[in-house]
Amino acid sequence: MDTKHIKISDYNYSLPDERIAKFPIAQRDHSKLLVYKHGVVSDDVFYHLPDYLPKGALMIFNNTKVIQARMHFRKETGALIEVFLMEPAAPTDYELMFQTTGHCSWLCMVGNLKKWKDGSLKRDFEIKGHSLTLSATMRRGEAGADGKAAPLAVGGGTNYWIDFDWDNENISFAEILEAVGELPIPPYLNRETQESDKTTYQTVYSKIKGSVAAPTAGLHFTDAVLADLDAHGIDREEVTLQVGAGTFKPVKSLEIEGHQMHTEYIVVHRRSLEKLLHHDCQVIAVGTTSVRTIESLYYMGVHLLKHPEVNEEDLHVKQWDPYDDGRDGGLVDDITPMQAIQAIVDYLDKNGLEALHSSTQIIIAPGYTYKIVKMLVTNFHQPQSTLLLLVSAFLHGDWHQVYDYALCHDFRFL
C-alpha cells in the first residue's frame, strides 16, 4: 500500500454529537468493552478486560499526567488573553521545569493574539497566604517600519516563546500552575472545564507531569482492574509520552502525505526495556500514545545499530522513518525487535544512562507493519484522524466492522 497517498476521506464515518462521551460514567471501569478477535466482534464490561488477556503478557501504560496548561490574563483594556503551554523551552526538561522557581520559558499557543501587541501580561493571585504577581512576556522579532515588533513564532508558526516571571523564589512553577492554571480538555467535548475534571481526566496511574491531554484509553482503568491484571499474571510496565495538543490536529490535506505530524517527547527507563526483552517484545499497549512510544523504540534501535555513534537527540523518529524512504530504509526486515531493543539497552550502558529521553513524530497508518505491539486497548477515535489510521493499520483495514458494531450497540465515543 502507498501509505503517503491514502485519502483521509476514506476514513470518515458519521458520529452524532450525542454519542460523544462528554463526561465519564460514575464508575470508570463499568464502561462498555468491545472485543475484536480473529475477525469476530463481541461486547462486555471493561472490568472483565483481564479475562481476555494471555497470562504472562506484558501490558504497557503511559504514566503521563495532564497539567493545568491553560492560563488566562486580562489586559488593562479588558481584553482576555489565553496562554496555552505547549512545550518547555527553558529549561527543556519537564521535571526540572516544574521544579524551577522565579523564572521559566515555554512555547505556547496564544488565544486572542491580536490584542497582545506589546508589553507583559500580569496576573495577581495568592499561594499559601502569599500574594504573588505572575508576568508573561512574549519574545518578539525586530521592529518593522511602523516601529512595532511582531511576535516571534516557532514550531511552524503556531507557537510563541513566552517568558514567565513571578516574585517569589520559594514558589515552584508547578505550584503556579496549580494556583492559576486550568486543566485543558479535548475540543471535541465542546464544554468548559469543570472542577471534577482534575480527577476524572487523569488516569489512576498518572505520575509524570507534562501532557496537555490525557491518554484517554487509560481512563477506564481502576485500582481494582489493575489488581485483577496482577491476579491474572499480566506483567505491567510504564513509559512516558507527553501528549501534546497536536494529537487533536485535524488532517486537512486530501492525502496524508500533506499532513505534518506533531512531535511528542518520550522517556523509557532501562527497566522497561529489559521487560520488553524478557517478554520477547510481545506487548499489549494501553492507548495510542503507548503504541507510538513502543513502536518508535524499534526505529531508534535500528538507527543505533546502523549508526552506533549517534547522540540521543539524533534518535528522534521522523514521520516517515518507518516507510520505504525512511532514513534507515524504512521496512528493515533484517533487524528483529529484540535486536533493536537490545541496541538501546547497550546504548544506555555505554553512556551510563538509566533512561532514554527522546522524541517521536511517527505516523502509523495502513501500510505500516507493527513490530512490537500485539494487542491494543484503545478508545474510539474521531473520523478522519491520524489515530483512526493507527487503528486501521492494527486491524488490517477492518475498522469499519468494529466502528459500525460500536455505533449500533450504544458505545460511547472519544
Where are these regions (language model features)?
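Surface-exposed, charge/polar-rich loops and edge strands
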Residues: 1-142, 147-414
